[in-house]
Amino acid sequence: MSTNPNPGIHQYAPSTLPREREREGATNSPQRNLLEFLCICVACIVCYYNSTQCGLVFDDISAIRDNKDLRPHTPLINVFLNDFWGTPMRKEQSHKSYRPLTVLTFRFNYLLHALEPFGYHLVNLLLHLSVCLLWRRVCRLLLRQCAASGSNAISAPSSSSVSQLNTCAFVASLLFAVHPVHTEAVTGVVGRAELLSSICFLAAFLSYAKSVGDSGCPRRTNWLTLFGCFGSCLLASMLCKEQGITIAGICVVYELFVVHQLRPLHLCHFVLRLFDERTEQQSPKLANPSGIRRWSSSTLWKRLSFLVGITLTLLVGRVYVMGSQLPIFTRFDNPASAADTPERQLTYGYLIYLNCWLLLCPSLLCCDWTMGTVPLLQGFTDSRNITTLLTFLALGAMVAKTCFTRNLALSRTLIMCLGWMVLPFLPASNLFFPVGFVVAERILYMPSMGYCLLVAYGFEQLQRRGSLSWQRFSQAALAILLLTHALKTHQRNLDWRTEYSLFMSGVHVNQRNAKLYNNVGHALENEGKFEEALLYFQQAVRIQTDDIGAHINVGRTFNNLKRYAEAEQAYVQAKALFPQAKPGVSYHARIAPNHLNVFINLANLIAKNQTRLEEADHLYRQAISMRSDYVQAYINRGDILMKLNRTAQAQEVYEQALLYDNENADIYYNLGVVFLEQGKSQQAQVYFNKAIELYPEHEQALLNSAILLQELGGEEARRVSRSRLYKVLENDDQNEKVYFNLGMLAMDESSFDEAEQFFKRAIHLKADFRSALFNLALLLADTKRPLDAVPFLNQLIRHHPSHVKGLILLGDIYINHMKDLDEAEKCYRSILHYDPHNTQGLHNLCVVFVERKRLAKAAACLQYAQRLAPAEDYIGRHLQIVLARLQKINKLPESAPERKLAYEDYDPLEFKLPQDRPTHKSRKRS
């Protein structure tokens, strides 16, 4: 055994790591490994099995249900071009959260079971279990290396010490498995970003430790492992979530204080030497030769350079992907970021305490901490500054302990715990840039690893050095902590079952957050409970009177309740909250796109009144003037212009919208409708096809293009038309229009039985579907089943009394097949009631008179019909036949029954044009 020339400074032992592995095999039995493995698995499953019964809620809606990047028809490359929510990274409204690997796993889930929540939650549970097991392995490695490097002897820790360290690692992973603050990351499906990133995060650390520790000497490096495994894991972690980049910082801490055994004071001394060469003479205690030699190690600088280089490279790449722009958030997302100095800095400091408190006491958890959840600290006199001060004192005390303790194992373990707590939290700390939230529980998933290790290490120290009573007390306290955490986690999962239960749990915790009340209102609104939703929206307005979104919600709910005057008033109030233009003063103000919805909603409400369409158009133009790239305003304005029959202008508006969003299927569809209105079917079909290319499930484009193809005719056109109609049915099997058009296709192919079934299905879904009712009746009549057609024709006339073709067909069946002239006459007279100049209805009424042998009345009727339609030859022919018969009857005696019947009910004035009827002049009184 060699002697150490510098007491308190322990030299690195080249044989430490190999001997450590030998010792591990002797002290770590397979039975214990299996038992710990099973305990962690059981803890995870017991805590989170009920999460698989939860639905897709909160952020899951945007990231999964509404994210087109998950759909199989979306090009896979889009996953790497868009942000986590499916918005192109180049767009201003993008959240700039680039997590393509996480989105790929969502896409895989969608491929297997679409939007069924169970699979998404099951994957999250398994990922959390994997993180816990990996964390146990990392803790074992870390604790043994810290203990070995801090030993006074070259040999590794004793067998009993290794066993205690393994217990510490097990406790850390078990506490991590059951901690309630992880519920949002595990039960919320979007938390998969944290889970995947953590797996790659831990794998990166293990690969780094392997690359610098395989040889047993810190002067050697396995560069292949470092570049290949570590680099890949670091990149993958960052592509799952941005926090993953911080593993490079943890590896720097590990390299300095564990691998090269530097002490924090060595680091201070080195920094001082950079600024003052005399430090060594003035501070001999700091000028430790061993520390200097370690700093001069070329291996250390090569590895640090590698870590810094790869980190900077990835950061530059990340900035490039973001388009060199930070995401833009509103002041409601993070109120402190919009506050003045010193309120902003004091609030940021208080948020650090709040995050620490959530780790220490996760009793009051909330899904949303934005808006007024945490009131801003009002200067230095705010009493909450005390908690901030105590937090920083506690952290400072731990830092001081690492610097001045002579127990090097303790020092290095504390350093790694602090590094694991602090570094992953830095991106969310507002230190470098303001973030879009106040507190986010899932952000604490990685930092909580360091916290759990710190608690476990404290427990291990009590077990090792405390008295028997302290050991029993610490064991009982740990058991209670694990049990209460597990129960809280299990109970917290129940809050995530539905959006309503989740947001109500938030309201119970925090009554100052207007967004929570808005979200409860949205949940009730989705269930059709508009009256209840209105109460929560109005409460949100009372809490945050300047929140435009809350006023919009109130207006929309009034609109759903058909209280249009109150809805308009709410929208006007929201509109009044926008920055007002001042004459002669120019200024720039950023308007959130979702706030501009007030113009859309107000215009849509006004447009219900046909006399106010121009006013609605003005609102759309006003919204466009505020944001020229506001595509939804262009789309809605185009609809208004179509109602105003200004199709050319509507076309220009839609084409302008394409300049800002040329991948919006709705715009291409609307352009297709414009060309359809202009009678340009071929151009319309081109735009419908483009809409389908961009969004293969676009229902209206599929339906309209199928109809155009059907009208085009031809076997290939009918085949494509049918495939598109069936595509619509895959997503909406209750669409009566699809069944009707499938029936029409079957008619074209003479598949009458199939057509009949499609028409009946359409009528079953919509009892007053006039086209389906008439075409089914016509089909039955044409296939020699006229009596079967009568019920459908009567149903048609009941819902649509003025349906002329239906009345004519029904009248014909009454005459030709049922011989019911009275009902036939009712049908034809009904036609003339709605359309007095309908030639066919009038002619058929004349035929009824002929069938009744009322020839005089029939002749007058046909003469009237001929005057209405002189070009119709068949009327003239029938008139000549009736007149010839009437001439023969007129030769009979007046008392003859045939002659009496011929002139029965005859009124010479019944069938006369208005100008042919005699007028009666009134005499003036003298």
Swiss-Prot record:
Keywords assigned by UniProt, alphabetized: Endoplasmic reticulum, Glycoprotein, Membrane, Repeat, TPR repeat, Transferase, Transmembrane, Transmembrane helix
Single GO BP term: protein O-linked mannosylation
GO molecular function: dolichyl-phosphate-mannose-protein mannosyltransferase activity; mannosyltransferase activity
Membrane topology reported for the UniProt record: Multi-pass membrane protein
Transmembrane portions of the chain: 37-57, 115-135, 170-190, 193-213, 223-239, 240-259, 304-324, 346-366, 385-405, 420-440, 443-463
EC number, as in UniProt: 2.4.1.109
Main location: membrane
Pathway note: Protein modification; protein glycosylation
TPR repeat intervals: 514-547, 548-581, 596-630, 631-664, 665-698, 736-769, 770-803, 805-838, 839-872
Extracellular side, ranges: 58-114, 191-192, 325-345, 406-419, 464-926
Region (Disordered): 1-26
Catalytic activity: a di-trans,poly-cis-dolichyl beta-D-mannosyl phosphate + L-seryl-[protein] = 3-O-(alpha-D-mannosyl)-L-seryl-[protein] + a di-trans,poly-cis-dolichyl phosphate + H(+); a di-trans,poly-cis-dolichyl beta-D-mannosyl phosphate + L-threonyl-[protein] = 3-O-(alpha-D-mannosyl)-L-threonyl-[protein] + a di-trans,poly-cis-dolichyl phosphate + H(+)
Superkingdom, natural source: Eukaryota
GO cellular component: endoplasmic reticulum; endoplasmic reticulum membrane
Positions annotated as glycosylated: N609, N645
Stretches assigned to the Cytoplasmic side: 1-36, 136-169, 214-222, 260-303, 367-384, 441-442
Localization per record: Membrane; Endoplasmic reticulum
Pfam families xref list: TMTC_DUF1736, TPR_11, TPR_16, TPR_2, TPR_8
Family: Belongs to the TMTC family.
Functional summary from the UniProt entry: Transfers mannosyl residues to the hydroxyl group of serine or threonine residues.
Protein name from the UniProt record: Protein O-mannosyl-transferase Tmtc3
Species annotation: Drosophila melanogaster
